[in-house]
């Protein structure tokens, strides 16, 4: 049986959640469970989630809004040995579970994520996607070189991050006080337990933020936020440059 619990934090994701849940229903092998943790959606997100509710797909309501809090709540309810954190607007390959289990079969690996290809209805954001791929490597090399050579790679939300449940709990999970770059913060904690690996497989994430900002502005904001984060600027300050676009 699969060991993977997939956790999806949601907030007003009615436009994409149904597609994502349909994709998860055809995974081979299937996930042990899918936990949808909603932060108070005001659209049809919760209704859509309940339509898919089953013995392996559960809907959880979070009293507190915020990805870190919602993902921690999902992790607390999860029964799998492995946790996979998935954004509602991200498409995954059918063998997602197998790739995750194979990656963590290496005991020297504490966590991992995928290569994110940013796509929209009419275009693929090759330039932005390439930068995000490279950022996984150059950000830790520049700002945490001692950890880079220990195996640190900085993963971000749309890369479908995964790790062992025990390592997640022992690392303290996501910091609820961090409103942005919470996955990167978790990488800093997980690398104390093993390498972080970006697997050579692609997931597709919505380009909705880039579509609103434009490629140049989006890349500039990503660079600015990443640079300030590397210098230790608080996530609370950085969040104001990364407004909600839904």
What are the functions of these language-model segments?
Residues 31-40, 60:
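Short beta-strand/loop segment that forms part of the nucleotide-sugar
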Residues 1-23:
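N-proximal low-complexity "stem/linker" segments adjacent to membrane-targeting elements
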Residues 83:
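Short aromatic/hydrophobic "clamp" motif used to bind/position activated sugar donors
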Residues 38-46, 90:
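A conserved acidic beta->alpha catalytic loop
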Residues 62-78:
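Glycine-rich, basic loop-to-helix element that forms the pyrophosphate-binding segment
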Residues 22-31:
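Short, acidic, metal-binding catalytic loop of nucleotide-sugar glycosyltransferases
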Residues 95-127:
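Conserved donor NDP-sugar-binding/catalytic core segment of glycosyltransferases
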């Amino acid at each position: 049986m699969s060991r993977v619990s997939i956790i999806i934090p949601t907030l007003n994701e009615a436009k994409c959640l149904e597609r994502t849940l349909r994709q998860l229903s055809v995974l081979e092998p299937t996930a042990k469970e899918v936990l949808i943790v909603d932060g108070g959606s005001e659209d049809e997100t919760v209704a859509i989630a309940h339509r898919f509710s089953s013995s392996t797909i559960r809907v959880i309501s979070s009293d507190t809004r915020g990805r870190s809090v919602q993902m921690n709540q999902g992790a607390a309810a999860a029964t799998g040995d492995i946790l996979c954190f998935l954004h509602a607007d991200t498409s995954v390959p059918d063998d997602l579970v197998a790739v995750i289990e194979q990656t963590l079969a290496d005991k020297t690996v504490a966590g991992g994520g995928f290569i994110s290809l940013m796509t929209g209805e009419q275009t693929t954001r090759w330039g932005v996607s390439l930068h995000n791929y490279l950022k996984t490597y150059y950000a830790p090399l520049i700002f945490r070189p001692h950890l880079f050579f220990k195996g640190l790679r900085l993963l971000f939300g749309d890369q479908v991050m995964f790790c062992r449940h025990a390592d997640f709990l022992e690392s303290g999970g996501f910091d609820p006080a961090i409103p942005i770059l919470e996955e990167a913060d978790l990488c800093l904690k997980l690398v104390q337990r093993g390498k972080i690996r970006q697997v050579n497989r692609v997931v597709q994430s919505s380009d909705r933020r880039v579509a609103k900002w434009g490629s140049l502005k989006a890349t500039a904001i990503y660079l600015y936020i990443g640079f300030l984060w590397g210098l230790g600027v608080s996530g609370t300050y950085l969040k104001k440059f990364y407004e909600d676009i839904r």
